[in-house]
Amino acid sequence: MISLNSSFLERSSVTGGSRTQSQSLRLSARRPVVTSMLNSNSLPERNVSVSVDSAVRDVNAPVAVEVDRSVGEKPFAAVGGGVEDMYGEDTATEDHYITPWSVSVASGYSLLRDPHHNKGLAFTEKERDAHFLRGLLPPVVVNHDLQVKKMMHNIRQYQVPLQRYQAMMDLQQRNERLFYKLLIENVEELLPIVYTPTVGEACQKYGSIFENSQGLFISLKDKGRILEILKNWPHKKIQVIVVTDGERILGLGDLGCQGMGIPVGKLALYTALGGVRPSACLPITIDVGTNNEKLLNDDEFYIGLKQKRAAGQEYAELMNEFMSAVKQNYGENLLIQFEDFANHNAFDLLEKYRTTHLVFNDDIQGTASVVLGGLISALKLVGGSLADQKFLFLGAGEAGTGIAELIALEISKQTNIPLEESRKKVWLVDSKGLIVRSRLDSLQHFKKPWAHDHEPVNEFLDAIKTIRPTVLIGSSGTGQTFTKEVVETMSSLNEKPIILALSNPTSQSECTAEQAYTWSEGRAIFASGSPFKPVEYNGKLYVSGQANNAYIFPGFGLGLIISGAIRVHDDMLLAASEAPAEQVTQEHFDKGLIFPPFTSIRKISAHIAAKVAAKAYELGLASRLPQPENLVAYAESCMYSPKYRIYR
């Protein structure tokens, strides 16, 4: 046997030269590593035991070598137990320790594998020489715009939306700046791919399509170690976390750990639409199990804990540790967005932490803000004020009650009447019928403010006929509940009924755009949570709006960041809802749109950010002082640009 006893292991630098003694890697423990010597045919000749002392000695000190003659001269077969390379990658050494070497400066092959710095064929001739890329790429140099054109061509070749989603996610993990430039410049086409509705299918099949982690997974097994796990994430200056426990993914129910697709998708939009730096975004899934029997028993590719979902004290303790750890690790100004938690946890978490953390629930608050913005816009077509309307909701969960509360709050501010009084203009229907005072004792706490004096009404259609609403809002998560009779009844009560079918994904929408326009004889003012194609009715083309939270949360988050806000206030949500409505033109109204097109979303986000930041300064909740004079310009200047950087 050959025994090597050396002071330290000298490594080569990324430029190919040897490191100095001060640059050399110190090994903290003495551990034998079995490797081999290779002959001229690259076959292993002898076993070599290398022991490296932790003590640092002279780099030029002699090395004692002892050859164990008991080892036969014949080379071992690679499959039978030899070691083919420095990583020891063969079946005989699967249980051996190896060191995953890495370098601090991306160069050469590693640079092409670094999504944050990779430019693909866009590396210039000078960059290829400076960073050891010569020969690792074809000789042609392609500009950024041509790369975008090529990628869009390739993505359009896929006919299946999930395949397009996978192509986009692969690109994000290969070339980050190309991904965001592609998404920004083709947002209307790609938004339904990277987010709803396609992301819903991606979450359902997440275990099957999972290749590389794009965020942090924290499970019950990690209790007591969450702070340690946060430090494993490579980026340290985190400004936004989107976190889910996977219990209520869109309208698809409990998908457990596979809900990770939602935080990943949301944060891609934070960057593309709101300009928040990708390195400042962290997707997190809290895995406390799942009650989805199909995932537990039938899906062999499920990536989460195969156990029933934790609840009660066990759940609360894990979430409390998480909330404490992220604040300790990232600071007071960290924005934590709760995403797709079930009703019973969503309201409790928001209520518990809104006074101690910078928290935001997109399902409750983001949806409310975007819908309020759509209503402000729609009233320009209908006429009258918000207080003149009567609202009826199908669905009394997070989205429904969140929207209802923000509407009531805005009415209260506009009319100077108490909030309790303004709530009386809003009615909700749940699975048991109209929410009325006689049901008060059996209602969940978040439904109780909406229990008005009225006789019980069990059927949704009967509630419409009784309440006679001017605005119908669906947040039930159940598809095709706005039937032909429902839409026709709304149309008989109103010249221009406002109908919002908000449930996601498309399969869960209360009705389609075509149904709404056809059944209302083209009179409905319609918007939906998922996108629908334009509809032609009686020779007129109707373009339905999408009440997508993506109008609000990216700009909202940017506003909190640029102001250094320490808490979220309801007045910020009201301020944010005004910006989309201000961007709707008469040309948009003529097509039936109550939301502006997504092509101008970064402009909208900058205006939302400015309004949110201004409100933060007004309320004394901003920590980034002094306040900039022009907040819109400041917001735009803070936005991430996907333009390639030039490397030395």
Swiss-Prot record:
Q: Which cofactor does it need?
A: Mg(2+); Mn(2+)
Q: NCBIfam families of this UniProt entry?
A: PRK13529.1
For this record, an example GO cellular component is: chloroplast
State the similarity comment: Belongs to the malic enzymes family.
Lineage, top-rank taxon, reads Eukaryota
Binding sites annotated in the UniProt record for a divalent metal cation: 339-340, 363
List the CDD domains hit by this protein, alphabetically.
Answer: NAD_bind_1_malic_enz (cd05312)
Transit peptide: which range?
Answer: 1-61
Its biological purpose is as follows: The chloroplastic ME isoform decarboxylates malate shuttled from neighboring mesophyll cells. The CO(2) released is then refixed by ribulose-bisphosphate carboxylase. This pathway eliminates the photorespiratory loss of CO(2) that occurs in most plants.
Q: Can you name this protein?
A: NADP-dependent malic enzyme, chloroplastic
> Mind telling me which Gene3D superfamilies this protein's record contains?
Malic enzyme, N-terminal domain, NAD(P)-binding Rossmann-like Domain
Query: Which locations, inside or outside the cell, does it occupy?
Result: Plastid, Chloroplast
Pathway, per UniProt?
Photosynthesis; C4 acid pathway
Q: Which UniProt keywords apply?
A: Chloroplast, Metal-binding, NAD, NADP, Oxidoreductase, Plastid, Transit peptide
State how the cofactor is bound. Answer: Divalent metal cations. Prefers magnesium or manganese.
Q: Extract one GO BP annotation from the record.
A: malate metabolic process
- Catalysed conversion reaction: (S)-malate + NADP(+) = pyruvate + CO2 + NADPH; oxaloacetate + H(+) = pyruvate + CO2
Detail which positions bind NAD(+): 248, 363, 504
Per the record's keyword annotation, is NADP included, yes or no? yes
Q: How does it assemble?
A: Homotetramer.
State the Gene Ontology terms under molecular function. Answer: malate dehydrogenase (decarboxylating) (NADP+) activity; metal ion binding; NAD binding; oxaloacetate decarboxylase activity
Report residues binding NADP(+).
392-408
